[in-house]
Amino acid sequence: MSKSAVIGFGRGWDGREAARQAVQAAMAQLGSNHPALAMVFAGQEYSTADIVQAVSAQLGNLPLWGFSTTSPLSTDGEQPHSVGVALLSGNGYKAQVNWWPNFAQEGSNVATQFARSVRNQAVGVQGVLLAADGVNGDASLLCESIDQMNLHVAGGLASGDFRQGRTFCLGGNHSEGGALSALQLGGRLRLGLGMGHGWKDSGWLWKVTRARDVWVQGLDGVVPVKVFASALGYPKNEGAFPPLSEF
């Protein structure tokens, strides 16, 4: 069986319908190939529990990994208000999903458990995809564990409803906030990783001196709107109007 990777997107009134559409769109592209792994990118508008339930109902007991996001992406650009389901088919490789629901509360212990799970894999792990809670928890300890590993690791912090302070990770039949989900890949599989960003150095650098939850309230001891007004050349009293109000 030749390897094949596809992705389908779906939209609906709820997560179940959107996920059902996404799976069907992906399966149509696979043709006669059978999926061996599912990766799910859930729009923040939907219940991730509903999405996991719908995907599992259609695909059975496949390894499932994913996270919530403000907007899934495709080659055609952003796909807002949607669910994306990527399917990988083929043989000769291994995929295992590990799930830790207590990442936000016990970051140090989870980082240790993650490193141990990689070392204890019977089949050598060649690469790992990670998704961690994007609001709660400290990912720095996890990054320290990754630095000590001689393998490809990629991933990031889940996005979603930052106003409510809730982002979600998906792993197996689990879907919760405050969690860490790891997809371990091995066997006859070639992996390549690349990274880039569109930011340009502006020369501005400020230290966050005060914050509440996800809201920055102080930069170098100054209210952020005053900092941005000075940097962008706007009067401080225009903080309630664009573009200052957008920061």
What is each model feature region?
Residues 1-58, 62, 67-71, 75-247:
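Small-residue-enriched flexible segments
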